[in-house]
């Protein structure tokens, strides 16, 4: 998330808070547009969605002027999880380790995990495990795995999400799709283990 994006979110949040304090009710989306210098109501809606996901506001999508500011005492402690590039759940692609954005999650969800990140799934090789194209996979950074773990593995600088099996003289990276064959390699680098999936419904 860019600094400019964060600043705009702060402007919108502060304006909503001040309007509720002054008038007793929240501003409309068009009033927010005018106050922060945005022309598009859809852009404001996207900022409101981010503020809601981060736990700063609450809305009722079926009604207008229903934005509610959530005070700090009501909020759960959140962590910003980096979304790093895109990996494949089909044919491997070049791993891109650049942070595209951040995704807020309650600290309760993370528990005692040391280092986590998210990667976007591409392809259908893990559908039988309930992992679909476009899902955000929540990954704990680890360098080893137990048989049966779903891992992010690097093979010659290409990343893939598969189920891990260390066998007699090779490693089997098994898709969860009966129509796709396993990847058999002598060795691979484990960069993470799947601990969760986030899916957004339209």
Swiss-Prot record:
InterPro entries hit by this protein: LexA, LexA-like, LexA/Signal_pep-like_sf, LexA_DNA-bd_dom, LexA_repressor, Peptidase_S24_LexA, Peptidase_S24_S26A/B/C, WH-like_DNA-bd_sf
Similarity annotation: Belongs to the peptidase S24 family.
DNA-binding residues: 29-49
MF terms in GO: DNA binding; serine-type endopeptidase activity
NCBIfam families tied to this protein: lexA
Chain positions of site Cleavage: 89-90
Quaternary structure, from the entry: Homodimer.
Catalytic activity: Hydrolysis of Ala-|-Gly bond in repressor LexA
EC number: 3.4.21.88
Protein name per Swiss-Prot or TrEMBL: LexA repressor
UniProt keyword terms in alphabetical order: Autocatalytic cleavage, DNA damage, DNA repair, DNA replication, DNA-binding, Hydrolase, Repressor, SOS response, Transcription, Transcription regulation
Annotated GO biological process: DNA repair; DNA replication; negative regulation of DNA-templated transcription; proteolysis; SOS response
């Amino acid at each position: 998330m860019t600094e400019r994006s964060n600043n705009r979110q702060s402007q919108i949040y502060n304006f909503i808070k001040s309007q509720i304090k002054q008038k007793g009710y929240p501003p409309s989306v068009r009033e927010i547009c005018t106050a922060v210098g945005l022309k598009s109501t859809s852009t404001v809606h996207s900022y409101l969605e981010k503020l809601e996901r981060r736990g700063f506001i609450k809305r009722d999508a079926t009604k207008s002027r229903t934005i509610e500011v959530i005070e700090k005492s009501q909020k759960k402690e959140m962590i910003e999880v980096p979304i790093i590039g895109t990996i494949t759940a089909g044919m491997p692609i070049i791993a891109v380790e650049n942070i595209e954005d951040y995704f807020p999650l309650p600290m309760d969800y993370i528990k005692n995990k040391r280092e986590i990140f998210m990667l976007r799934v591409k392809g259908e090789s893990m559908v039988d495990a309930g992992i679909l194209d476009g899902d955000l996979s929540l990954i704990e950074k680890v360098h080893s795995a137990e048989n049966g773990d779903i891992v992010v593995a690097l093979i010659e600088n290409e990343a893939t999400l598969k189920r891990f099996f260390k066998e007699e003289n090779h490693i089997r990276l098994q898709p969860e799709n009966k129509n796709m064959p396993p990847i058999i390699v002598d060795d691979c680098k484990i960069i993470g283990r799947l601990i969760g999936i986030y899916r957004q419904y339209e």
